[in-house]
Amino acid sequence: MLNKLSLLLKDAGISLTDHQKNQLIAYVNMLHKWNKAYNLTSVRDPNEMLVRHILDSIVVAPYLQGERFIDVGSGPGLPGIPLSIVRPEAHFTLLDSLGKRVRFLRQVQHELKLENIEPVQSRVEEFPSEPPFDGVISRAFASLNDMVSWCHHLPGEQGRFYALKGQMPEDEIALLPEEYQVESVVKLQVPALDGERHLVVIKANKI
């Protein structure tokens, strides 16, 4: 699996240390193991997880601005855990409402000794925003409109929303409230992955 990951990273132009690669593989192995009992993801094959979960998450890392992020609807830690491994200097709060997912996240935190993550079981509407976050990240969580509506209290004055999407979500962008501005839409290159991937970066015009 290490060879496959190394080839994928090379194709994506991403450089990681051996320690980071081993952490990513350990995470995939844990996800594969726990998935049999907890049904954390529909992806069953660990090699497929490397592409659809690991690479699909970490290609976002260069576009994240700031040091303090919250992964909303994190599920089994996607994209938060892969991002925390490739951005060890940043801190990631992993928010999910389901206990079984948060238990898995805490086990990953313990086994991989990830000191820059904080798994939290909560609904996003009830989660406090003090201090506010530099970035609010979501992957397959909600529409853009719902994301900014439910998470409006989380980013700081210079904070951003980072929404990981498949095809270009033009309809969702058109429905955004006027106080939110799309700063950029990045077409992501994910080697070995069929279909399009986009990152939508939204700025809240907070006064």
UniProtKB/Swiss-Prot annotation:
Main location: cytoplasm
TM region(s), chain numbering: none
Intracellular or extracellular location(s): Cytoplasm
Gene Ontology CC: one annotated term: cytosol
GO molecular function: rRNA (guanine-N7-)-methyltransferase activity
EC number: 2.1.1.170
Catalysed reaction equations from the record: guanosine(527) in 16S rRNA + S-adenosyl-L-methionine = N(7)-methylguanosine(527) in 16S rRNA + S-adenosyl-L-homocysteine
Family note: Belongs to the methyltransferase superfamily. RNA methyltransferase RsmG family.
Protein name: Ribosomal RNA small subunit methyltransferase G
Lineage per the UniProt record: Bacteria, Pseudomonadati, Pseudomonadota, Gammaproteobacteria, Enterobacterales
Gene from which the chain derives: rsmG
